[in-house]
């Protein structure tokens, strides 16, 4: 794999810390003028092949895969351009802001025989595979509950009127898209598509800072709790 990384955030640093354990031939990174210093710092620290501040330059290079680690609302736009340039795409969660965007990306990838996937690894963990294979042996569930709640480091700024992407509804922020998506992914991977879904959220300044998603599977219910305004016990 010849990998092109979009972004310089914490999640990118996490990936780069394990990059030498992966079958990756070369790495290039795309930053912005605003993150220029950080981009060059990462480029040097992890001995990358090149760094870029122009997406077209990166797409013209010999990379074969693009990893999209940008704010949620940018996933679709940058992934689409990568696919149209015949690059495989790995996208951080949530893969897109809505279903219509995802359908279009899948269509393009299928037409060009490319791979597109969301960077959620729970499906590949041995413990998850064991759980899925033995779920019927455990017995029929009645209530399945998952909780991913952590007090966001950006929440205090949000309360003071500083709206960062993680709390901006125009940029696909909020508890559902940022945290609860992990719970939903886990439940759907185990049990498939629910019959009915209901989301009840705590709304502050037009964004869900926390919420409960109820998934109805007829014979049992799944409850997904996600919060950025408080933490779980």
Model-found features: residue ranges?
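Beta-loop-alpha module in the N-terminal Rossmann-like domain of NAD(P)-dependent dehydrogenases
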Residues: 15, 46-106
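Short strand-turn motif at the edge of the Rossmann-like AdoMet-binding core
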Residues: 93-94, 119-122, 148
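N-terminal Rossmann-like dinucleotide-binding module
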Residues: 1-46
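Rossmann-fold dehydrogenase core element
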Residues: 104-121, 140-144
């Amino acid at each position: 794999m010849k990998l092109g990384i979009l972004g310089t955030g914490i999640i990118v640093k996490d990936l780069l810390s394990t990059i030498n354990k992966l079958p990756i031939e070369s790495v290039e990174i795309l930053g912005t003028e605003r993150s220029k210093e950080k981009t060059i710092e990462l480029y040097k620290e992890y001995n990358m092949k090149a760094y870029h501040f122009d997406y077209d330059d990166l797409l013209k290079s010999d990379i074969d895969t693009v990893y999209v680690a940008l704010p949620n609302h940018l996933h679709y736009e940058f992934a689409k351009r990568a696919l149209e340039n015949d690059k495989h795409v790995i996208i951080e969660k949530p893969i897109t802001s809505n279903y219509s965007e995802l359908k279009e990306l899948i269509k393009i990838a299928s037409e060009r025989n490319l791979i597109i996937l969301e960077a959620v690894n729970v499906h590949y963990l041995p413990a998850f595979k064991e759980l899925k294979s033995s779920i019927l042996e455990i017995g029929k569930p009645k209530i399945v509950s998952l909780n991913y709640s952590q007090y966001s480091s950006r929440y205090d700024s949000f309360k003071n009127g500083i709206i960062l992407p993680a709390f901006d509804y125009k940029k696909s922020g909020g508890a559902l898209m940022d945290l609860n998506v992990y719970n939903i992914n886990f439940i759907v991977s185990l049990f498939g598509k629910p019959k009915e879904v209901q989301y009840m959220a705590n709304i502050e300044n037009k964004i869900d800072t926390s919420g409960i998603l109820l998934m109805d599977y007829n014979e049992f219910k799944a409850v997904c709790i996600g919060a950025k305004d408080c933490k779980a016990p």
